[in-house]
A protein has these predicted regions:
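Alpha-helical bundle regulatory/interaction domains
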Residues: 79, 86-194
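A generic short-segment signal for beta-strand/edge and adjacent turn/coil regions
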Residues: 13-19, 34-41, 80-88, 133-135, ...
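Hydrophobic residues positioned within well-ordered beta-strands of beta-sheet architectures
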Residues: 46, 66-68, 114
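N-terminal low-complexity or simple alpha-helical regulatory segments
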Residues: 1-62
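Residue-level recognition of well-ordered beta-strand positions that form the cores
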Residues: 49-51, 69-71, 117
Length: 194
């Protein structure tokens, strides 16, 4: 059987009531299920379930983007221009770029994780302006963490694991509001990292 490099999209399921779209992909090496929730304008929370060696996203999303990835199971590898990083269970990365990464690699052919993509040209400038004691500005958080580079990785930490563990088990009935709170919590925690 000939190996097809790119996963072929075999189905798209939109659940308007839940506010998400699920994309199903497959090739002779495996499959992937990607569920995208739009949380705020310009902010997506994405559940990734991948069982193949590589995944070409094929996204045309451009702008000033911040990508946050959390690895729950397996391993994900990504190249950002001249930088290369990988995440194992519990690890988190923050990266800045002008367009979505097109290819992710999965050497174990097994990956479950959550991604948060923030397009700062479309998202609110301040996520927490209605809370007087909380100042969360995603672009400033990413610039401080990434410094002069394009990415920042945190190896497995309990406080990061706690935030994401709740995202994997949230009941459907209040997912949308809960996603907003958890993204705000994550950005607040990241803003406190020195």
């Amino acid at each position: 059987m000939k190996h097809t490099e790119e996963l072929l999209k075999i189905d798209t399921v939109t659940d308007t009531a839940a506010g998400n779209t699920t994309y199903l992909f497959q090739n002779d090496k495996g499959d992937a299920k990607i569920t995208v929730h739009t949380v705020f304008p310009g902010v997506e929370l994405i559940y990734n379930s991948v069982h193949t060696d590589r995944f070409h996203l094929g996204s045309k999303t451009e702008g000033h983007l911040i990508e946050i990835h959390h690895c729950r199971e397996g391993r994900i590898e990504q190249q950002l221009e001249d930088e290369f990083f990988y995440l194992m269970p519990g690890d988190l990365s923050v990266s800045m770029r002008s367009r979505r990464a097109e290819e992710y690699r999965f050497p174990l052919r097994h990956y479950h994780g959550i991604s948060i993509v923030i397009n700062t040209e479309e998202s609110p400038k301040c996520f927490s302006c209605f809370l007087k004691d909380v100042n969360v500005q995603p672009e400033q958080v990413a610039k401080r963490l990434c410094g002069g580079g394009k990415s920042f990785v945190i190896r497995s930490q309990d406080y990061i694991g706690h935030i994401f563990s709740e995202l994997y088990t949230v009941p459907e009935s209040y997912k949308k509001g809960y996603f907003k709170i958890k993204i705000l919590e994550l950005l607040l925690v990241l803003s406190g990292i020195d």
